[in-house]
């Protein structure tokens, strides 16, 4: 949903410009990922590319853009490129604010669903969350940090793990909406 929302925003802007949005799904796990992206850009003769997470984090892809002379913007949790080529999200701040909110509500035992370690957003959200908890003197035990992969299915699976935690958490912080929806279904 995150990327779809970005696409809707881009479409709103492009309607006034005469440019079109071309969406090309990428499989970062593929051995031919970089070559496939290069070929697509060359064949389509793209004016510019907006790289969304997690492909935006791949420096090899940014290098291909520079080699081809293709304008690009990277959306990521931290600055990975020149300022004019970056949109930096506030993942750490969002995690911190979520922790503060839950702490103000009186929660001290909070389960945290994180995304893949390879995703910078997952690291930033967790770091911010832990910083927010620390402001209230709350620690995050390792057994309350559950590894997912930003999918509904992983949230569903982690929901059953949450039910096995003893003592049970009084709140859950999911690192993205898909895992949150999955854990909500599992806990209901």
Give the residues covered by each predicted segment:
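Intrinsically disordered, low-complexity polar regions and short flexible loop motifs
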Residues: 49
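A short, glycine/small-residue-rich beta-strand->loop->alpha-helix junction that serves as a flexible
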Residues: 2
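Short beta->alpha connector loops
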Residues: 27-31, 52-57, 178
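Bacterial carbohydrate/catabolite-sensing allosteric modules
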Residues: 5-23, 42-45, 59-60, 66-188
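Glycine-rich, highly charged phosphate/nucleotide-binding loops
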Residues: 30-36, 96
């Amino acid at each position: 949903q995150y990327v779809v929302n970005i696409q809707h925003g881009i479409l709103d802007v492009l309607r006034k410009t005469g440019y079109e949005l071309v969406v090309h799904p990428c499989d970062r796990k593929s051995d031919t990922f970089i070559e496939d992206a290069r070929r697509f850009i060359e064949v389509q003769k793209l004016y510019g590319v907006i790289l969304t997470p997690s492909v935006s984090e791949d420096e090899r892809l940014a290098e291909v853009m520079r080699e081809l002379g293709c304008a690009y913007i990277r959306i990521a949790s931290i600055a990975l490129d020149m300022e004019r080529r970056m949109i930096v999200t506030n993942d750490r701040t969002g995690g911190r604010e979520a922790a503060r909110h839950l702490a103000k509500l009186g929660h001290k035992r909070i389960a945290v669903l994180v995304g893949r370690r390879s995703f910078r957003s997952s690291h930033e959200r967790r770091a911010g969350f832990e910083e927010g908890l620390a402001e209230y003197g709350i620690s995050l035990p390792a057994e309350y940090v559950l590894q997912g992969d930003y999918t509904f299915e992983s949230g569903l699976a982690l929901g059953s793990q949450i039910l096995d935690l003893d003592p049970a958490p009084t709140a859950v912080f999911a690192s993205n909406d898909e895992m949150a929806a999955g854990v909500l279904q599992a806990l209901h």
